[in-house]
């Protein structure tokens, strides 16, 4: 992991198993897709970005466990929206390890849909639907 800049966690675990990330390269990014792999101690030592603070701090996610441990959410630096709207920098420093925890983003749905659409175009399979909404709805928009 010392030379790895990006780690994506996508598992079905219910309790954290990663409690030490000292071997991860400085300035790396962890995509906390499955939300329960990282121990609270890892969350608390990293730069945390989330899609929705209220969503991510529930259901025994890693950020939720960190919140329970320290009694606040101050370890979450900002939301993805704050970064995309230039209200916050993407990174605090070049050496911090950043964790992105996307609870309500549907990131896996988006990734799968992109892959399916790409394969459909490449193989010439599938049916293109010109409009998603029924015609009466489309006229009112």
Question: How should each PLM-predicted stretch be described?
Answer:
Residues 15-17, 38-39, 57-58:
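Short glycine-rich, flexible loops that bind phosphorylated cofactors or substrates
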Residues 1, 25, 39-44:
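Short loop/helix-cap segments at secondary-structure boundaries that form the rim of catalytic
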Residues 17, 31, 35-36, 98-100, ...:
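Preference for short coil/turn "hinge" residues that link or interrupt alpha-helices
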Residues 2-4, 138-141:
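Short, solvent-exposed polar/charged micro-motifs at secondary-structure junctions
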Residues 2-33:
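Rossmann-fold NAD(P) dinucleotide-binding segment
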Residues 41-140:
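Adenosine-phosphate binding glycine-rich loop
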Residues 10-12, 33-35, 52-53, 102:
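Fold-independent oxyanion-binding glycine-rich loops
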């Amino acid at each position: 992991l010392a030379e790895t800049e990006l780690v994506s966690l996508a598992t079905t675990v219910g309790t954290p198993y990663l409690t030490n990330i000292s071997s991860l390269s400085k300035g790396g990014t962890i995509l906390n897709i499955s939300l329960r792999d990282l121990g609270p101690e890892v969350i608390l030592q990293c730069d945390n970005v989330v899609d929705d603070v209220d969503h991510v701090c529930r259901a025994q996610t890693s950020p939720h466990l960190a919140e329970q441990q320290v009694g606040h959410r101050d370890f979450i630096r900002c939301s993805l929206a704050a970064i995309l709207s230039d209200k916050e920098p993407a990174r605090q420093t070049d050496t911090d390890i950043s964790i992105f925890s996307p609870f309500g983003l549907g990131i896996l749905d988006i990734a799968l849909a992109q892959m399916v659409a790409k394969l459909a175009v490449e193989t010439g399979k599938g049916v293109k639907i010109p409009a998603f909404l029924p015609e009466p709805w489309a006229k009112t928009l």
